[in-house]
Amino acid sequence: RKLFLHASPVPSYYQLHVPFLIWMSEAYRKGYPVQYEAVCMNREKPVAGNASVFHSMLSLGGIQTDYKEDSLSVASKRYVTRPRYYLNDHNLPKLLDKIGLKEKDIKQLEQRKMMYP
């Protein structure tokens, strides 16, 4: 497809589809049922990893701080999905529907039920 890796002006589906995985042991699930239930509740929702990782890790670790935003944590029942952005080759965030994705990449996103836009 003649694309270079990260920060292509117009990315391909393969640059946008980054798995977000959380594994919990049986002991963790029993010890932290609220976080476990929240993760289960949010498991099919789209995640903007760059925005959610920090806040999700705080929630999963039971860390309380003024910096934690529950609406960004997949381990919170207050998690809210947000539009997905792509950081372009000029280091600027652009909405997925504003970057000129190719039709085959849009179809890949839709087939995998990834939020677009």
Show the residue positions of the predicted features.
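Catalytic domains that recognize anionic headgroups
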Residues: 1-117
